[in-house]
């Protein structure tokens, strides 16, 4: 198995596995060039955050404070807003040939969310040909966070 990841959006851009004839085939949906990921908005393979899924009417209340987020999906906030993590550049550190750590720092108020936050995504290719993804977030004040990966398998 071969996995290709870009730091633009923390995206898995290809997963090559052998087919029944031993030919390597890509099994994730995506584009052929980084320029396509930049110019054609999509979530293909991306790390989604600060908050994956929809937030109703782009509003939430935390510790008695109401927050209004951008409404980018039929009146709701989807996947962290129009400039969510999927459109950000992560710092990348190759820990070893099987492990990559991606880090993104979002400032207080980015896309309307409270708190400075440092998010880490550890992607590991396991010995049994699985991709293990672990998420970690540290913040300096109460906030909401719900990260995921948006790879679509063929």
Annotated model-derived regions:
Residues 1-154:
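Surface-exposed acidic/polar loop and edge beta-strand patches at domain peripheries
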């Amino acid at each position: 198995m071969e996995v290709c990841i870009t730091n633009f959006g923390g995206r898995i851009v290809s997963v090559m596995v052998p087919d029944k004839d031993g030919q390597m085939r890509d099994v994730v949906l995506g584009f052929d060039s980084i320029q396509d990921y930049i110019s054609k908005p999509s979530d293909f393979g991306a790390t989604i955050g600060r908050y994956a899924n929809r937030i109703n009417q782009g509003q939430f209340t935390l510790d008695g404070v109401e927050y209004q987020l951008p409404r980018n999906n039929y009146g709701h906030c989807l996947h962290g807003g129009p400039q969510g993590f999927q459109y950000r550049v992560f710092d990348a550190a190759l820990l070893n040939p099987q492990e990559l750590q991606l880090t993104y720092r979002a400032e207080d108020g980015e896309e309307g969310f409270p708190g400075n936050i440092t998010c880490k995504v550890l992607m590991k290719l396991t010995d049994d040909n699985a991709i293990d993804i672990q998420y970690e977030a540290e913040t300096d004040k109460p906030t909401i966070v719900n990260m995921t990966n948006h790879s679509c398998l063929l």
